[in-house]
Amino acid sequence: MIGILGGMGTQAGLDFCNKLAILNRGKIDQEYPLFILFNKSNIPGRPESIGVQTKNLSDKSKNKKVKKKYHSVLKSLLQGCKVLKESKCKFIVIPCNTAHYWYEDLKKKINLPIVNMPKEVFNHTKKKCKKNSSIGLLATEGTLKTGIYNKFFDRDYNLIFPNNSLQKNSVNKAIKLVKMGKVREANKIIKPAIEFLVNKKCKKIILGCTELPIAIFAFKSFQKIKTSKIFLDPNLILANSAMKRYLKK
């Protein structure tokens, strides 16, 4: 059984479940995959809980706050993983890119496999793109700051991000609008950031926040870009990986 730790955000978790079901359509109910979605929407905000500790003694109080926020999110993620483990799930997926900042500590504390979303996206990209290609990344500021994609991609690819203005006024706003249920508005807002990466000759664009595929694929916008298969949807890639692992059990 697949364990899905969702709620980051809720629509992203539901989007993952939908993709999981579509990937393995059954003719009857019994042919669909067994999975449990724990929509743990009370996990503290991930971008707000990311900070960089410094060695400056005057920043001790700041470092304590950073550490406290980090462990607050870790504790909540761990609680969710434990619920899925107790529900007899064989492995866990987390359809939230930023949450993978806590991946290594989670893995140490829970005796159950957790599929690493950024790693799966990297493995998928290796099959599609030559080394040293330019790869665009649309994501939260938290994901960009922590380098969870850089960790895998910097060895072989040139990751390109939107500039600060586009990050703030296009990407961040689009993500927020999806969380608010305003998908049509998000679809319009994200357009300048996509055009920026296309003009930078990116071979692929990673939709590195699970709200972004919802914004982009909900309507008929970007039809020409979509047909070029430039977008990499981490939720879909993760769902594919989960199904392969599930079918091996």
Model feature map: region roles:
Residues 1-249:
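Non-catalytic structural scaffold of enzyme domains
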